[in-house]
Design a protein with these regions (language model features):
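Divalent-cation-assisted or electrostatically stabilized phosphate/pyrophosphate-binding catalytic cores
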Residues: 39-40, 91-102, 164, 210-236, ...
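Alpha-helical phosphate/pyrophosphate-handling elements in metalloenzyme active cores
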Residues: 34-64, 158-190
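Conserved N-terminal diphosphate/IPP-binding helix and adjacent helical/loop segment
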Residues: 2-34, 38-45, 143-146
Length: 324
C-alpha cells in the first residue's frame, strides 16, 4: 500500500493473515450441498444475491446479509434459516443459533464490521429458491467450470472436482466484504465487484491463462463481446441503474489503485490460492486425521462400542497393520 511504513504494512499483513482460517471455512460453501435444492451453498447464495439485486434491493443490504449468512454457514453448513424455521424453531431461537455459529468463527473480522454484519442474521421470509427470477447469465456461470491451474507453454493441470464460476464469484464477493474495512472500501461496492468480475465467462468458456494467451491481441474483444451480452441481460432484469453500477465496478477493478480494487483483488487472489490449498489438503488427507484430529468416532452413548468394533476389525491407529 502506498504511503505506509514497513511497520504498518506488516500489521496489515497480519490482519489479512488472521482472516485466512475463516476464509478457508467460508470457502467450503463451494463444496457443501443439501438434499432439498440443487447447487452448493455458494452457488445458491450467488443466485439469491442476483435475485435480490434484480428486484431492486440495495446492494449494501444484500452484501451484508449474504456475508453474514456465509460466515454463519462456516459451522452450520446447510442448516440455514429456512431449514430451521421448517423444523419449527421459534424465530428468536433461530436468531440465537445463527449468531452462535457466526460468533464461533467471526472474531478475526474487525469489530465494527462484525457487529454490523451480525445484525443481518434475522429469519426473514424466503421465497422458494427454484422460483427466484434471475438473469440467464447466473445459470450459465453456475454451469461454467473454472479452468483450474494453467500456464502457457505447459500441459493443462485439470483438478477435480472443479469449482464453478458462480461459486468463485460469490466467495470472492464475501471475502471482499470481510476485507473491506482493511482497505477502506465500501462493502456494497466490493461485493458487487465480486459478483460481476467473471460476467464474460457466462458465454466464454474458461480456458485459463493458457487459452487466453492463445487468443493474443483478440482476447479483449472476445471478453468484451461476452461481457456485453451478460450486461444486456442484467439491464433487462434489473434495470439501467444496476447495469451502470456493475459497469462502474468492472472499471474499478481493472487496477488495484483504489479501495474497491484493492479489497477485490485481495479477495480474488486469496480465493484462487485457497482453492489450490483445498486440493492439496484433500489429496493428503489420511484416515488418522479423520479418527484422531476430526474425532470421527465422537463422544456419545455408543462410542465405546464403536471403538471396540474398529479394534476387532484392525481399523484403529493403535493396531499394527492399520489401514491394510
Amino acid at each position: 500500500m502506498r504511503g505506509t511504513s514497513e511497520a504498518e504494512r506488516a500489521a496489515a499483513r497480519d490482519r489479512v493473515g488472521d482472516l485466512v482460517p475463516l476464509f478457508t471455512e467460508v470457502g467450503d460453501a463451494k463444496r457443501v450441498r443439501v438434499a432439498h435444492t440443487p447447487g452448493s451453498l455458494a452457488e445458491r447464495a450467488f443466485r439469491r444475491s442476483w435475485a435480490a439485486l434484480c428486484r431492486g434491493e440495495a446492494v449494501e443490504s444484500v452484501a451484508r446479509r449474504e456475508s453474514a449468512r456465509a460466515v454463519a454457514a462456516a459451522r452450520l453448513g446447510g442448516l440455514d434459516v429456512g431449514t430451521l424455521l421448517r423444523a419449527g424453531l421459534p424465530k428468536d431461537e433461530v436468531v440465537r443459533v445463527l449468531r452462535r455459529s457466526f460468533d464461533a468463527v467471526a472474531e478475526p473480522v474487525p469489530e465494527s464490521l462484525r457487529s454490523r454484519l451480525r445484525e443481518f442474521l434475522v429469519p426473514e421470509p424466503e421465497e422458494p429458491e427454484g422460483s427466484l427470477p434471475v438473469p440467464d447469465f447466473v445459470q450459465r456461470l453456475a454451469r461454467q467450470p473454472r479452468a483450474g491451474c494453467t500456464r502457457p507453454g505447459r500441459p493443462r493441470l485439470v483438478l477435480e472436482p472443479p469449482e464453478n464460476h458462480a461459486e468463485h464469484c460469490m466467495t470472492v464477493a464475501v471475502y471482499a466484504v470481510l476485507l473491506s474495512e482493511e482497505f477502506g472500501a465500501e462493502p456494497g461496492r466490493v461485493f458487487l465487484a465480486g459478483l460481476v468480475h467473471h460476467l464474460h465467462n457466462a458465454g466464454m468458456p474458461d480456458s485459463g491463462f493458457t487459452g487466453e494467451a492463445m487468443l493474443g491481441d483478440k482476447l479483449g474483444a472476445v471478453m468484451d463481446r461476452y461481457r456485453e451480452e451478460a450486461l444486456t441481460e442484467l439491464e433487462a432484469s434489473g434495470g439501467a441503474e444496476l447495469r451502470r453500477a456493475a459497469e462502474r465496478e468492472i472499471r474499478e477493478i481493472e487496477t488495484a489503485d483504489g479501495p474497491t480494487g484493492r479489497a477485490f483483488h485481495a479477495a480474488d487472489v486469496l480465493d484462487r490460492v485457497l482453492q489450490m490449498h483445498h486440493y492439496a489438503r484433500e489429496a493428503s488427507f489420511t484416515v488418522d486425521q479423520a479418527l484422531e484430529e476430526m474425532d470421527l468416532v465422537h463422544d456419545g452413548p455408543v462410542k465405546s462400542f464403536h471403538e471396540s468394533v474398529l479394534a476387532r476389525a484392525n481399523l484403529t491407529p493403535a493396531n499394527d497393520g492399520y489401514g491394510r
